[in-house]
Amino acid sequence: MSTLVQCGYFERGQCQSCRHIKLPMAQQLAAKTQELQQLLAPFVDNAEPQFLPPVVGDSSGFRNKAKMVALGAAHAPVLGIVSPSGEAVSLCDCLLYPADMQALLHRLERFVQQAGIPPYRVDKAKGELKFILLTRSQVRGEYMLRFVLRSRDAIARIERELPALMAEYPQIKVVSVNLQPVHMAILEGEEEIFLTENTRLEERFNDVPLFIRPKSFFQTNPQVAAKLYQTAREWVADFAPASLWDLFCGVGGFGLHCAAKDIPLTGIEIEAEAIACAKMSAQLMGLDKVQFMALDSTDFAKGDAAQTKPELIIVNPPRRGIGESLCHSLSEFAPKAILYSSCNPKTLAKDLGHIRGYRLTKVQLFDLFPHSDHFEVLALLVKD
């Protein structure tokens, strides 16, 4: 396993985001595995071989999303970050991005210059362009491009230059403007204005169609994410559940991988854009017994849903975990199994302490975030 030892940004002290980039991948994985095993040790029954080998992908060129701060001036824009020393650093050559994405990021710097859009200055509360957000679909190499602006003032300039950009890069399928008028370092605002007829980007993992809209969460490492979803599919299939819940379902990645035409699936996600994407996928797959609803997962589990208990429950919460209340609800529902996908092993361990009547039978680490402290964990809990 290789590592990104030649990252110039890191060597020059301009970007420290990949804090472990100087360590061999094997050493990075060993540290992550040790942390996971220590956190989950209280829940491990030595009678069962819970920890499976970690799943890894490429150490460079794997990331499908760029969040670039707009810096510099209208005549000399910089897309990247502010370095620890306060320098505006272009990150267009970041090695986490595929080569075609790097090239497009450079082109977007020229686009901003040609359009004459002044980057927003937080210290002076002046300027227009705050961020550029670029998302890449691996299935066709297509892109969604978002401009985060302070106001509507620069939209006409973007529209003026956009035809030339899209003629040069026909793989750009979705373009939008997000309005973020607040004088704070907030990534995006409430209002999204589409500049293209298309409003979603298509992705495909393991023959499952998935869709990305501007505000819907999507995994940033598609290579390893596809393996994560496939593993979930295989683990769930072992139980042949007659009904499924997918809580914190996002665009439906887990549930749609585990669904079948004769199995009722209920997916719950608070973000309405993600639910719209999940419904579209289910329709394409011909899944008539699937329902996706934009609700809070904890509230859903406490409501009328408690009358129809599923045989298997999938949870994929944000970093805060599912919380004590939902843990108690899951314990009361008593499904055959609970499949927990976590991006924070600390809150996973905390939640496991609140789920009663289950044993941990499988745990697998998925390294979606090389060179960082973060990783994804898939944990299978089986009813005692």
Swiss-Prot record:
Binding site for [4Fe-4S] cluster: 7, 15, 18, 94
Reaction(s) catalysed (UniProt annotation): uridine(747) in 23S rRNA + S-adenosyl-L-methionine = 5-methyluridine(747) in 23S rRNA + S-adenosyl-L-homocysteine + H(+)
Annotated residues for binding of S-adenosyl-L-methionine: 219, 248, 269, 316
Keyword DNA-binding included in the entry's annotation: no
N-terminal signal peptide: none
SUPFAM superfamilies reported in the protein's UniProt record: S-adenosyl-L-methionine-dependent methyltransferases
Gene Ontology terms: biological process: rRNA base methylation
EC number: 2.1.1.189
Keyword annotations from UniProtKB, A to Z: 4Fe-4S, Iron, Iron-sulfur, Metal-binding, Methyltransferase, rRNA processing, S-adenosyl-L-methionine, Transferase
Active site residues of this protein: 343
Taxonomic superkingdom: Bacteria
Function summary: Catalyzes the formation of 5-methyl-uridine at position 747 (m5U747) in 23S rRNA.
Protein name as catalogued: 23S rRNA (uracil(747)-C(5))-methyltransferase RlmC
